[in-house]
């Protein structure tokens, strides 16, 4: 909780922060409370801090007073800052003077209210140690009293940079600096929202280091929308540019600084090269599906960054379909494929792939298993399919804790370079999580999967089950699949780019005929029946079918068959 703005207390001096370890980011206020501008931790005053505040004595320093330093009593004088390239006239205009107290020289910056009264000062010695006098509150801006509205105002981190910009503009145009530096830029700018809103443009000329760039992003978010410009300098800050002969570059930024654009928003005008590169990249060209050309006609394939949902009733051919696509993409197209088949062991997955590749149902034939081991074909088949290290499998049968699974999928993409990852199936991930709210769990998981696919450019194929209909025939008996039949959360259909449904009547007179229906395709907008495939019991493949009968004749067959082995 940030209470630093609500208190009438005044800032005393900087102290170390026990929470984040900053040596001087923490601030002690007159009522004893502290606030760290680095980690933003607010701590209420206790007896210890109240006692320190009452003494107002920073470590190694001299007792301070609530009163500002008097120009005459402090042997004050206005002087050019020759080492900084700043004239006496500029210092006098801004209220930046030299004091000599107890034989020690100080630079003093007067902070004034809009009536011109000095309310606080920032005092700096030759070793760059700072302290303040008076009521140095969170809205402190050096030079604020000089300007009231206009076309542009420049905001710098420190007083020296502010004086530099004033010098180059002959003290004619608005410029201020942050009273508490870059670490408090957001708080200072937020506290001065109405003041900054008087200007048409607000130019943030912060330091070019990491802290300065971070401060720009934080401050810009709390300033009037559409008015913020960001200066980019060739040196660390405005004064360093001035000392190195880059005055022209400073003024160029005053007049032509680019607008601040928040993360996530880009100008289309800036995308020419990115679009040119994308048009010729593999991500913009779809990976084609096998088994049914109509899928490609309606979807134009699967593109990088897309989530492809495959669904059907139980035992309808989902796993066979995705294994077939994996084999096609890995062998014919040379893509690297990751498979997380959570309902089977990696041995079973590999055996099915070997069988498909050689057009035999290897796992279902004990005699064939023995034969290829004895005659040496196993090694030949294995090397032909896996010798080029194209396929990578998730080796944790029935273990699908969400974060662990996502970490493994991320490794498949970033560490192994997989172009396609297949997840079979999403329901087992949800059931393994232990969450009581399945809908919420699917929402979170789909959001993470979508973000993963989009951010990495991988094609992510996910298998999803269907919910049981309330009445009427089951999906396993040829019931057409609707996009609302996906089991779980609406996120399944909302976050998927393409949804492919497989339909067949396991008990009909054509139990091996599979209707392919496109329920959604974000890329083309095309939906509907894509065609038919037929399961070949000899080869284990879903092959293109010339069947072109009406959908009703496919879905309403009433004969029964026991062949449900997919």
UniProtKB/Swiss-Prot annotation:
**Pfam families under this entry?**
DnaB_C, Helic-prim_T7_N, Toprim_2, Zn_Ribbon_Prim
Keywords, A to Z, come to:
ATP-binding, DNA replication, DNA-binding, Helicase, Hydrolase, Magnesium, Metal-binding, Multifunctional enzyme, Nucleotide-binding, Nucleotidyltransferase, Primosome, Transferase, Viral DNA replication, Zinc, Zinc-finger
Residues reported in the UniProt entry to bind Zn(2+): 17, 20, 36, 39
Residues at which Mg(2+) 2 binds:
237
Q: Where are the zinc fingers (C4-like)?
A: 17-39
The entry's free-text remark on the cofactor is: Binds 2 Mg(2+), one of which is catalytic.
Instruction: Name the site position(s) for dTTP/dATP binding.
Output: 361, 465, 504, 522, 535
A GO molecular function assigned to this protein is: DNA helicase activity
Record's InterPro entries?
DNA_helicase_DnaB-like_C (IPR007694), Helic-prim_T7_N (IPR048774), Helic_Prim_T7 (IPR046394), P-loop_NTPase (IPR027417), Phage_T7_Gp4_N (IPR013237), TOPRIM_DnaG/twinkle (IPR034154), TOPRIM_dom (IPR006171), Twinkle-like (IPR027032)
Q: Where is this region: Disordered?
A: 543-566
Q: What is known of its domains?
A: The N-terminus zinc finger domain is essential for delivering the primed DNA template to the DNA polymerase. The central core domain contains the primase activity. The C-terminus region is responsible for the helicase activity and binds 1 Mg(2+)-dTTP.
Q: How the protein assembles, per its UniProt entry?
A: Homohexamer. Assembles as a hexamer onto linear or circular ssDNA in the presence of ATP or dTTP. Present in a mixture of heptamers and hexamers in the absence of DNA. Interacts (via C-terminus) with the viral DNA polymerase that is bound to DNA; this interaction is essential to initiate leading-strand DNA synthesis. The priming complex consists of 2 DNA polymerases and 1 helicase-primase hexamer that assemble on the DNA template. Interacts with the single-stranded DNA-binding protein.
The function of this protein is: ATP-dependent DNA helicase and primase essential for viral DNA replication and recombination. The helicase moves 5' -> 3' on the lagging strand template, unwinding the DNA duplex ahead of the leading strand polymerase at the replication fork and generating ssDNA for both leading and lagging strand synthesis. ATP or dTTP hydrolysis propels each helicase domain to translocate 2 nt per step sequentially along DNA. Mediates strand transfer when a joint molecule is available and participates in recombinational DNA repair through its role in strand exchange.
Into which family does the record put it?
A: Belongs to the Teseptimavirus DNA helicase/primase family.
Protein name, as recorded: DNA helicase/primase
**What lineage does the source organism belong to?**
Viruses, Duplodnaviria, Heunggongvirae, Uroviricota, Caudoviricetes
